[in-house]
């Protein structure tokens, strides 16, 4: 969805509220409770309440309003955002060594997202279901089972797409934010003293009074800004202006009113700390509030799941993850996809997390390390873009980076205190994903280099075949080639073993460009290499899925007629064996072999009819 679509600005803004702000919009369920629950050594005291409220408000202003919405969202790739997009932009005009460092940062940021995404659905849904403790305390043993049931249903409907229920997201989330604002305003009116916390000096006073403990407490404050990265990642769906408009007109005021309303309640009734969010509501409204909270957390979880699907597709298309089955669930919206393997792996991980941690307060101890780590990396990558791509003054860029890091690094460092109490979980998951992505990329490069290191010139081979042709058989043969100027392995092995060649040979390369989409005019490039050889290069963006049938259709429009069911597709199938390596490289090689065995086969990946495919095997030592 973008402003290019003929939709009104209010409609797009409403849709952005429904998708983009689910995570950060459900943070009031648990943030202030975790800040003042006593784990940091101070109770519900006036100075502590004012200090936390001031920190939360000014973090929302600085991190979300200024850093992400004003600065980072300027860095877009054809309207698209996200940490991998930022990585790609930052590396465009830098040296090879610097680019390598930026790529590593981007991959770490993407890996951190995988680590946190296991926690987000669990903590969001559990914190909503925990409202049962207020409504009916005897039902507290049902919190874990009900959370699992809700999330099971959510993961089960993914294969059907979210187009139908997605239409309900926006009105539900708008209702949610209005409820946040209403509950908070009602409490603030009863105790207006809490508005003094808008003064940033209360945050300064908080650090001066509580010293080291206040620094550690930042690990709880950061819960208020989790989901900030989603604003940038979802930029391509809604556009910059609608996302900014939604934040400043609806989301920020609602969050501020609710946090300060909880603070006003706690100043009057410190015992409300057991669940200040639900205790804001009158008794008659608790059950309706519980229902709308559950719906809001499901929507927040859906946004995160969709984000995982999008990030995975981007990583696959950029060559950082092995090919896997990607199902389009909407004929109208290319961004709506379903990846079965990712969906069920994530589901299993979320259920294990819920059963292991049992309460959202325990999960809060695991939340934040990966989020703040990504914030640090985003600051570095975005300021690199400002310097290298926008050519801003280096001293001005340095000041911006210092300002960002003065907030990001303390938040990240404070969250390291959570390492042993649960923070190891997202870090471990992120580390696994980083190893997987770097292994696939590096070993794939090693394999391709090994396969072509002794190859002859493509032009020389074609000239030789035209001069002394082998037996030619009727029809068209398509040889899939990973690189433009190399001889496809399948072609060499077909000549070696079968000693025949089709009357017409097409060397097809499917290429992923550094852009989300490629215009149809630039989709296919055709070059005739000889009277019987053609080279076809089809370009796709990383948000698009290659389709050979579409390529053939466009070839026909440009004069190279091809009929899918009358064409033979020759592909190479590599049987890999490990050569002599140091032990650590041998481990990486074994991981690559495992990934390779489970990768989606090329015919399925490019939607080629199986009965038209001929695979020629070859053994390659890596």
Swiss-Prot record:
UniProt keyword Nucleotide-binding, yes or no: no
Coiled-coil segments on the chain, per record: none
UniProt keyword list: Cell inner membrane, Cell membrane, Ion transport, Membrane, Potassium, Potassium transport, Symport, Transmembrane, Transmembrane helix, Transport
Domain of life: Bacteria
Membrane-spanning intervals of the chain: 9-29, 49-69, 103-123, 137-157, 165-185, 213-233, 247-267, 276-296, 337-357, 363-383, 396-416, 419-439
Subcellular localization, as worded in the UniProt entry: Cell inner membrane
GO cellular component: plasma membrane
GO molecular function terms listed in the Swiss-Prot or TrEMBL record: potassium ion transmembrane transporter activity; symporter activity
Topology term for the membrane: Multi-pass membrane protein
InterPro entries on file: K+_transporter, K_trans_C, K_trans_N, Kup
Main location, first listed in the record: membrane
Catalytic activity from the UniProt record: K(+)(in) + H(+)(in) = K(+)(out) + H(+)(out)
Pfam families per UniProt: K_trans, K_trans_C
Family to which this protein belongs: Belongs to the HAK/KUP transporter (TC 2.A.72) family.
Function: Responsible for the low-affinity transport of potassium into the cell. Likely operates as a K(+):H(+) symporter.
UniProt name for this protein: Low affinity potassium transport system protein Kup
